Swiss-Prot record:
Gene Ontology biological-process annotations: translation
HAMAP family assigned to the protein according to its UniProt record, in alphabetical order: Ribosomal_uL4_B
Keywords noted in UniProt: Ribonucleoprotein, Ribosomal protein, RNA-binding, rRNA-binding
Name recorded for this polypeptide: Large ribosomal subunit protein uL4
Length: 228
């Protein structure tokens, strides 16, 4: 069953309504699945270029520092052993690939669960536009955002073609801008409220709603994998 949401103007008035498709905005949120998808997304952003040198890679230390017996000291074979300052590192980090395989169906299910959670909490808004006219105005954008929500962190979903709104919003602190095609679970969850422009909302709904492989819930096998 679809839910309707008021479309608000920059001054807070109502300018019609939009229908929220149930298969996108009214599904059961799978916390374990959302966690897995977010962890995978953050892991994909890691460079994995960290590296340390072992005692065999550190320069120097090729000569035995002193003879084996007769000095009263513990025997040593190299000044580049781990116990020495400037020596090699034991079991230190080495370059690796942190990326995890995340099926597209799981990403879609996690995103829909996150959006549904925001709708149920009254933290998703649809607006007609951000600023009027063709001239960007950060002041107008700030006033409009505070009219729609008092949340500390706000995710605004708008098309890159909405250049005036994009330029007006991009300098606002704690306001994150994203194109509908790039909307993801992490950005929805890390921000308190989600604000769609009407044009971006229509584009987002038209996209995933057409895909036959885009499901509102993960399969039982995927859910079991997420819970492990």
């Amino acid at each position: 069953m679809s839910v309707t949401l008021d479309v608000r103007t920059p001054d807070g008035k109502t300018d019609g309504t939009v229908e929220l498709p149930a298969e996108i905005f009214d599904v059961q949120a799978n916390i374990a699945l959302m966690h897995q998808v977010v962890v995978a997304q953050l892991a994909a952003g890691r460079q994995g270029t960290h590296a340390t040198k072992t005692r065999g890679q550190v320069s120097g230390g090729g000569k035995k520092p002193y003879r084996q017996k007769g000095t009263g000291n513990a025997r040593q074979g190299s000044i580049r052993a781990p116990q020495f300052t400037g020596g090699g590192t034991v079991h230190g980090p080495q370059p690796r690939d942190y990326s995890q395989r995340t099926p597209k169906k799981m990403k879609v299910a996690a995103l829909r669960g996150a959006l549904s959670d925001r709708v149920r909490a009254g933290q998703l808004h649809v607006v007609s536009h951000v600023v009027g006219g063709e001239q960007p105005s950060t002041k107008q954008a700030r006033t409009a955002v505070r009219t729609w929500t008092e949340a500390k962190r706000v995710l605004v979903v708008l098309n890159k073609s909405e250049e005036t709104s994009w330029l007006s919003l991009r300098n606002l602190q704690n306001v994150h801008l994203i194109d509908p095609s790039q909307l993801n679970t992490y950005d929805v969850l890390v921000n308190d409220d989600v604000v769609f422009t009407k044009a971006a909302f229509e584009r987002f709904v038209a996209g995933p709603a057409k895909g036959k492989t885009a499901k509102a819930a993960a399969t039982s096998g995927e859910a079991e994998e997420a819970n492990q």
